[in-house]
Amino acid sequence: MSETNINQGQINKAVWRACDTFRGTVDPSIYKDYVLTMLFVKYLSDVWQDHWDAYQKEHGDHPDLIRELMKNERFVLPPAANFYSLYEHRHEPGNGERIDKALHAIEEENIQKLSDVFQDISFNSNKLGDEKQKNEILKALLEDFHKPELNLRPSRIGRLDIIGNAYEYLIAQFAATSGKKAGEFYTPAEVSELIAELMAPAEGDEICDPACGSGSLLLKCANQIKNAHNGSKRFALYGQEAIGSTWALAKMNMFLHGVDNHRIEWGDTLRNPKLLEDKGRLRLFDVVVANPPFSLDKWGHEGAGDDPYGRYRRGIPPKTKGDYAFIL
């Protein structure tokens, strides 16, 4: 087994073990967002620290130069707004408030990429229990992500795909424990792969998923192009997701897979489509894939006859069959 495979398995197991902190006290449908967000923050922090150390070896006597170079990073982390600062203060009261402040600072520093991504999650929420329980849970979570197996520095793990794969692994595990609710944020990998193979997206394609969930299906389409064209990134991914917390998962999923050429919008595709041309017309795409919510009975039937975008020219779907609204 290669080092890459060993690392992938270790990382998958380690991030799943981090969930033990919540089990028995917080519902999985709630704590999944906390674990996935912490994985994202840990990755950003490890990349930042890795690159800082590399610059320090090269320009050790010029700290101002290092700070200037770090401004060009893919994601910029403000002072104290990183995993390691949070970990150092884990024994003190106020873990939830500190994490929330760090997320806000990271978002503000990277506003074009991360605008609103953390607005639906609060580590200071009473969903995690009273102040004492919450502080203990978050202390344990920080300690779980500080373990050697979750050293996510590029100099250690190599390919970014390993982190993206771990994120997808977590989403799949949460889906397996969520029953019917899993359909709100996840399409099984086997189904996604089959759809992507059948659609056979080509290099240069613009690909859309109007009910994108956590973005897994879009990423499978991206992988089809990468695998067929020596890792090519000549494609663009578009999506829209109605549930705010799931939209945030999709955004983080894209970044953890190194897919920055994406546009994922938050909103109800049927009632309020966001993927529009400059003149307000619906944008057209080379490939459209979806696993839409089935049998929606409140999808906007009452306004479909006056749809400003000219949809439903072939007829208006039944009031209780909103899935047809995605294909007519």
List each language-model region with its residue ranges.
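Non-catalytic, mostly N-terminal accessory regions of nucleic-acid modification and defense proteins
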Residues: 1-203, 263-265, 269-274
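Generic recognition of stable, solvent-exposed alpha-helical segments in well-folded globular domains
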Residues: 6, 10-17, 39, 161, ...
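Short, surface-exposed linear patches
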Residues: 56-58, 261-262, 286, 310-312
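Short, mixed-charge, low-aromatic patches
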Residues: 147-155, 283-289, 316-321
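A short, mixed-charge helix-start or loop-turn motif at secondary-structure junctions
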Residues: 177, 232-233, 311-313
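Conserved S-adenosyl-L-methionine
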Residues: 181-290, 295-306
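Mobile active-site "lid"/loop adjacent to the S-adenosyl-L-methionine
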Residues: 294-325
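A short glycine-rich, Lys/Arg-flanked "PGG" loop and its adjoining helix->strand segment in the class I
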Residues: 328
